[in-house]
């Protein structure tokens, strides 16, 4: 009763709402109301009104905080359900909470969805990791094997099959000998092993690709070139040794074995080819005077080795006649090569001094390209004779396999 007096506006609402239960209570007990006295009826009606007002005030108090503090109520219900009903599953708890709290459905659904997601997402994330760590599909295993084969080096295996073993030897003394060259890109030094039988001799075996390789020796911290190996010059004019590596010749026995293996792997022949093979195996005598014809090949004369040197290599007269006839056939009776030239060959070209020795030479040099000069004139100053009051000075420089000729024409005043 104290709560209703402090809020007169709520009293009116509660009285209006509570008329129905009062009438219902009175209707339910008509016999008692008729049999009791007026004083007893008044006391009973007062008690009934007090009970109804208390019920309405409790329901009104319970309805107001549902709108103001829905979140706090929800938290309390979750905590009470977790403590009071530990045996109930989480899914059923969430469903009952949604059914009971119809006023705050939007906020409660979001919070409940977050809770369910938090409990279920780790399981979903953990299952593929466990599967990947424990088991892998055959497709992934095949990809891993292919990657391992690629990492092992497919091109390197091809190169190793083409490499040829080569022995490099140094025979000019020294205590420590190393070799470096184009096969190491001039960056690494490979130590040579001394020979136990021969003092001052070193050797090493390398596997190199076919081609030309240049190298130099480092003997006691000094760059040197072997006199027992072919020598050439590099781009800077320094002497280097070189070696030409060739692919080994194929062994005929191995080829025969491979051909037999290839024949064994061939598919079965057709009917016609099998008949042809059977005809080849038939006897030579066909009857009635017909026989198979076999051509008798003349045997080759046996060859023998001899120590006699032919006269063309020992007799000077025979050698001179032999080379003279060869040159005559090649030059078509041109004997100009027998006389020495007045100038070096590079200065007799059309580009240099407009001079032609013969008409044939003009026809040969009409392309405008100079012939390959001799190596002794490289990096030298060459001059020609003064013609028409003009002096010609030239120099030739080589870069790899190209030759560059620079010509300077200087006029000379006649005194």
Swiss-Prot record:
Gene Ontology BP annotations: cellular response to glucose starvation; filamentous growth; invasive growth in response to glucose limitation; regulation of cellular response to glucose starvation; regulation of protein-containing complex assembly; signal transduction
Top-rank taxon, per record: Eukaryota
Record GO cellular component, one term: cytoplasm
Biased composition, class Basic residues, residue ranges: 9-19
Any Pfam family hit: AMPK1_CBM
Keywords (A to Z) from UniProt: Cell membrane, Cytoplasm, Lipoprotein, Membrane, Myristate, Phosphoprotein
Topology relative to the membrane: Peripheral membrane protein
Keyword GTP-binding: no
Region feature (Disordered): 1-43, 55-158, 249-276
Chief subcellular location: cytoplasm
Induction (record text): Induced upon shift to nonfermentable carbon sources.
Single Gene Ontology MF annotation: enzyme-substrate adaptor activity
Transmembrane intervals: none
Description of how the protein assembles with itself and partners: Component of the SNF1 kinase complex, a heterotrimeric complex composed of the catalytic alpha subunit SNF1, one of the three related beta subunits SIP1, SIP2 or GAL83, and the regulatory gamma subunit SNF4. The beta subunit serves as a bridge between the catalytic and the regulatory subunit. Interacts (via KIS domain) with SNF1. Interacts (via ASC domain) with SNF4.
Known role: Beta subunit of the SNF1 kinase complex, which is required for transcriptional, metabolic, and developmental adaptations in response to glucose limitation. Has a structural role, mediating heterotrimer formation, and a regulatory role, defining carbon source-regulated subcellular location and substrate specificity of the SNF1 kinase complex. Involved in the regulation of aging. Acts as a negative regulator of nuclear SNF1 activity in young cells by sequestering its activating gamma subunit at the plasma membrane.
Anything else known: Present with 300 molecules/cell in log phase SD medium.
Name by which UniProt lists this protein: SNF1 protein kinase subunit beta-2
Organism for this UniProt entry: Saccharomyces cerevisiae (strain ATCC 204508 / S288c) (Baker's yeast)
Gene transcribed to yield this protein: SIP2
